[in-house]
């Protein structure tokens, strides 16, 4: 067996680089984090060949002392910690002293730096782990690091790299995360000599819009909770913005991007009542806590962390998001923020640029940021701006109208007449309303009396509730309502589903069970063996949900009682679905954790079905319930319950003012 021998420092660095520098994006992260720790207010990044051929990072930070510039490329050499106590209280982005040494061991690295009190800069080069002697160089205050030909001396590692486009995408994503965490720092990115983006120092609100997108910003809810010792802030997207991807999920702990299971689980739990399982929420969350309350020294990449009190963190994240999402009700926020834009896309109307207050300058242009008048390219890292604001239109294509046949016209008029036919009750309501509001009106003779449109009975705009008042039912599916300055479309089944669900949850929390009523005649149905077994195992649980079933023998079950709230539902289908849920859940201990899922299934059965004709009082009652129900902007599956089209959007649709 060979004798034990100490490995050369250069080989040790190359082995360490396998953990620290897996790809160009990791090298970029280490260098930019050093710039942030140096107090830079501007960081410029240039990439060639996706970062494989060249990574160049320049900053205007404090720079490196000439006597320390060689030491900066040695392993475990750092200015950020000196004792173990410093490590426990570290607040800097980097602290291990491995980053630059690892990069220098697998690339051709050039480090040039100058401090403010130095007459010139100092430059040192490293190739294959060998350092050159420091030399004088011309350079402004700050530091520039160039890492060329990454993995040139480790061909086996280089074979594992992906294409230049893929590696560039990882680099751009990494830089976007760092820019998002530090909005007070200006960032720019060039790819193969072409400017990709240039972000000035800006507010967090503006930085989120620039990185995550204006569509996210429009559909997001701001959050800010906690105290000086533990604070959570940022923005979370409304459930209707949810996607099937996780590319818009950002967790930052003390301004460090992390992938933490505790925070992600808390987010998932907060969204579980308003989001379908196949969709993922979008969010930008910043958690600030004392450095000693979190261990960032878990992995060299520092994306994995450990909280000292993970339960406290979980509760803060869950309760903050849950409260924000519970307030997504019709009287507080819109269900869908871009309904007008979606409608414009359907009709093929093309937006044209809108003149801004700054004579065409984009979101990031200001006199203070760009005194020379140069306007930066604010596209995101992949070349798209993501701007979706409503704009004036040009080259518009008007919606086409088609003539109806005589038969279709008569059918439409019959439907209209049925919806708007007046009854004595409606006349009485209108008369009472007019008298209460306007006093005694001059009487009309029958010969001169004219029919009053139903909409005349709607209160004035100043008296309208958030969802207004219903004026019609469309196709047996939607409710059409008029609000203060807009037209509303409400999915009556989805809305009723959410209202019933929240009512049942509240009743279960207050009473421990759902109030039930016995059926005059029990309803029997043929059941499967699994359904019979579920009844035998969970009869008491079913009673807690307001369902009383009995086994009649011969695989026949009888429904004897059903929840009062769901009295008009199909009790057989309801019983089958609840039994199916219980069979899937299994043991009684896990039923509690799946209670909301069972209630969601039940609420679906008790909701208004498509095709059912509602009276105006019934429609308005549903609208008022929505205004007073938490999370009423989405149904139990995360779909929107209502959309709003403002008068401006309707005018645009009909080309008014063009």
UniProtKB/Swiss-Prot annotation:
Region annotation (Disordered) ranges: 114-138, 355-405
Protein name: DNA mismatch repair protein MutL
Alphabetical list of InterPro entries matching this protein: DNA_mismatch_repair_CS, DNA_mismatch_repair_MutL, DNA_mismatch_S5_2-like, HATPase_C_sf, MutL/Mlh/PMS, MutL/Mlh/Pms-like, MutL_C, MutL_C_dimsub
One GO CC annotation: mismatch repair complex
Disulfide bonds: none
Function: This protein is involved in the repair of mismatches in DNA. It is required for dam-dependent methyl-directed DNA mismatch repair. May act as a 'molecular matchmaker', a protein that promotes the formation of a stable complex between two or more DNA-binding proteins in an ATP-dependent manner without itself being part of a final effector complex.
Sequence ranges of Basic and acidic residues compositional bias: 114-130
Alphabetical UniProt keywords: DNA damage, DNA repair
One Pfam family per UniProt: DNA_mis_repair
Any one Gene Ontology molecular-function term assigned to this protein's record: ATP binding
Source organism per UniProt: Neisseria gonorrhoeae (strain ATCC 700825 / FA 1090)
PANTHER family: DNA MISMATCH REPAIR PROTEIN MLH, PMS, MUTL, DNA MISMATCH REPAIR PROTEIN MLH1
Record family assignment: Belongs to the DNA mismatch repair MutL/HexB family.
Lineage of the species this protein comes from: Bacteria, Pseudomonadati, Pseudomonadota, Betaproteobacteria, Neisseriales
GO biological process, any: mismatch repair
